């Protein structure tokens, strides 16, 4: 019964979760307006997806790490390993708007007077450095607004960035460098996901997919 085989087709557990480009676009369009929180949230979402950052890397960004003129971020990953990440046009524009007088400066005026608060790129409503927990809450809130459920996380945006680049033809080495993986094995998991999805589609759609293939595990 071909229908029975189709019913059990799915990408195996353990691969990084990613969302498709249409859903990413819906998410990135949820912050509407020009208030400081809107500018901040838009910059967070665009930077997480556009640069493929870990949430800890995003919250650790300081003003000197952002080069809007040359469109680069200086990022410190695991073990304080430094890398330079390119900024796409949308992420650059969102960061520029947030770091203007209408965005970050408004929240900075509310800060408890610490040098670190003055340096951090992303701030909370009190003008203090935004925490990882706060970033997760922002991403989750906009995920709900975009109709993506309540389990959207910053890491899903990182995974989506890598997946979409590979699907567009980027080399695995370039994606490894972008994500800051010390081992290419960490990046190869994304190609495994693509292969699993291709196999699932093949088994569902190809009229000559054989019975023994349908029974195979991924």
Give short role names for the model-derived ranges.
Residues 1-218:
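Conserved catalytic core of the tyrosine transesterase superfamily
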């Amino acid at each position: 019964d071909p229908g029975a085989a189709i019913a059990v087709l799915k990408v195996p557990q353990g691969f990084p979760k990613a969302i498709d480009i249409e859903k990413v676009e819906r998410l990135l369009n949820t912050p509407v307006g020009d208030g400081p929180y809107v500018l901040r949230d838009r910059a967070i979402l665009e930077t997480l997806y556009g640069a493929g950052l870990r949430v800890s890397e995003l919250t650790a960004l300081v003003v000197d790490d952002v080069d809007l003129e040359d469109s680069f971020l200086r990022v410190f990953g695991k073990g304080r390993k430094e890398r330079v990440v390119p900024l796409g046009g949308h992420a650059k524009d969102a960061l520029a708007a947030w770091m203007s007088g209408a965005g970050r400066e408004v929240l900075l005026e509310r800060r408890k007077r610490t040098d670190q608060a003055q340096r951090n790129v992303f701030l909370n409503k009190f003008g203090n450095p935004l925490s990882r927990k706060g970033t997760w809450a922002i991403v989750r809130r906009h995920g709900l607004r975009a109709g993506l459920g309540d389990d959207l996380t910053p890491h899903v945006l990182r995974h989506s960035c890598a997946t979409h680049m590979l699907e567009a033809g980027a080399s695995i080495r370039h994606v490894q460098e972008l994500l800051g993986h010390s081992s290419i094995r960490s990046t190869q998991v994304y190609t495994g996901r693509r292969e699993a999805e291709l196999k699932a589609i093949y088994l569902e759609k190809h009229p000559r997919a054989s019975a023994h293939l349908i029974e195979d595990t991924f």
